[in-house]
């Protein structure tokens, strides 16, 4: 008769308790990179929308490794990043209890997609948000606005830019833009405030924040799975086949005393839709939406865009700038992703390696052939009946 061990490592991590639904849909930056006044003034984060995944082929550049200068295949995630629009600046002062916002200065003109963020029901509202505030920019040549900016320069130590996405440029049906604070690092406080003021109502391109071969962090809310049992939620072992009243359970949930179930015991409940930060994703490429060959390489010179044949499944076409990062990131397609510069200087060979892509797969992600472009498919298949019907 077989026997089992009486002790085993626990199943599942207790590091992410409580496993409950995230309070906010957008990933929140809880820590920004440390400020260095010696560096030039720059932004430290951005936002984008997850489009999907694809495959790339490249030569590994890692001297000493067995695969050095050999082709490897890697999975990448495409995140569509239309330019952000800066609409405000916030100044923070340091107190014994942490940072406290001193004042917020808003731009004169705000688009409707960000104004929707301030209303529960945009359709029934009077849409009067910021009409009174906008007059401050005209009164006395914006003296009150200048006064608030000077207060930030005088008292604050941390400066953050308020920026929102241009969600209307994506295939999403949602009309309400996502708004976030992006910390400004580098230079003096006065330099930071002037930098933020000059960004008002201007687009912020993704390549002005991140660059190729950089390591970044992706903050998002994971895919939700609803109420799940203990086996799938915690990875506990299934009980033997002849077990009474169910197999996918925990056989013993605790001792007689203490006479309650301890918090460390694996239980059924909410799985997924958790706030997570995925660290150290290498940027393989930053593509421009205006470039007709933004998925072409020196090895594959065919003119093709990053959108695969038939579009990204459950997303559509990527018509704007995009960022390609190595591996998978949290969240489902269409979900907003918060992209942040890494918190620590990266020194590993993987981080410092220069990546040169040889080929990017743009075939259908729905299983209809391996054709990379419509022209390639037409050349192979010839004239089809549906083409004749369409032309007629």
From Swiss-Prot:
Claim: Cytoplasm is one of the keywords in the record: yes
Keyword entries, A-Z: Allergen, Cytoplasm, Ribonucleoprotein, Ribosomal protein
Main location: cytoplasm
GO cellular component terms given for this protein: cytosolic large ribosomal subunit
GO biological process terms held by the UniProt record: translation
Molecular function, one GO term: structural constituent of ribosome
Protein localization: Cytoplasm
Family statement drawn from the similarity comment of this UniProt entry: Belongs to the universal ribosomal protein uL3 family.
UniProt cross-references to PANTHER family, sorted A to Z: 60S RIBOSOMAL PROTEIN L3-RELATED, LARGE RIBOSOMAL SUBUNIT PROTEIN UL3
Function description: The L3 protein is a component of the large subunit of cytoplasmic ribosomes.
Protein name in the entry: Large ribosomal subunit protein uL3
Organism: Aspergillus fumigatus (strain ATCC MYA-4609 / CBS 101355 / FGSC A1100 / Af293) (Neosartorya fumigata)
Lineage: Eukaryota, Fungi, Dikarya, Ascomycota, Pezizomycotina
Protein encoded by which gene: rpl3
């Amino acid at each position: 008769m077989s026997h089992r061990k009486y002790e085993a490592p626990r199943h599942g991590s207790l590091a992410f308790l409580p496993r409950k639904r995230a309070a906010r849909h957008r990933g929140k930056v809880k820590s920004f990179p440390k400020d260095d006044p010696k560096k030039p003034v720059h932004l430290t984060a951005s936002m984008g929308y997850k489009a999907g995944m694809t495959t790339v082929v490249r030569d590994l550049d890692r001297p000493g490794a067995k695969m050095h200068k050999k082709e490897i295949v890697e999975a990448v995630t495409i995140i569509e990043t239309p330019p952000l629009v800066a609409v405000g600046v916030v100044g923070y002062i340091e107190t014994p209890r942490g940072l406290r916002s001193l004042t917020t200065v808003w731009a004169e003109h705000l688009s409707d997609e960000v104004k929707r963020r301030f209303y529960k029901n945009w359709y029934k509202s009077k849409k009067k948000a910021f009409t009174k505030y906008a007059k401050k920019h005209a009164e006395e040549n914006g003296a009150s606005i200048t006064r608030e900016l000077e207060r930030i320069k005088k008292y604050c130590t941390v400066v953050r830019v308020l920026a929102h996405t241009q969600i209307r440029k994506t295939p999403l049906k949602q009309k309400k833009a996502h708004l976030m604070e992006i910390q400004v690092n580098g230079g003096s406080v006065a330099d930071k405030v002037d930098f933020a003021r000059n960004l008002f109502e201007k687009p912020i391109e993704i390549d002005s924040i991140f660059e190729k071969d950089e390591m970044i962090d992706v903050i998002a809310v994971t895919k939700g799975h609803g109420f799940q049992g203990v086996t799938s939620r915690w990875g506990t072992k299934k009980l033997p086949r002849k077990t009474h009243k169910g197999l996918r359970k925990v056989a013993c949930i605790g001792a007689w005393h203490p006479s309650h179930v301890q918090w460390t015991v694996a239980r059924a409940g909410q799985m997924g839709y958790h706030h997570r930060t995925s660290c150290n994703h290498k940027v393989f490429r930053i593509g421009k939406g205006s470039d007709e060959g933004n998925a072409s390489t020196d090895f594959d010179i065919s003119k093709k865009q990053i959108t695969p044949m038939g579009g990204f499944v459950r997303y559509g076409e990527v018509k704007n700038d995009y960022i390609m990062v190595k591996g998978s990131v949290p969240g489902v397609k269409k979900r907003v992703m918060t992209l942040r510069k890494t918190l620590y200087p990266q020194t590993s060979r993987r981080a410092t390696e220069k990546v040169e892509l040889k080929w990017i797969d743009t075939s259908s992600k729905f299983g209809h052939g391996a054709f990379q472009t419509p022209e390639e498919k037409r050349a192979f298949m010839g004239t089809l009946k549906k083409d004749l019907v369409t032309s007629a």
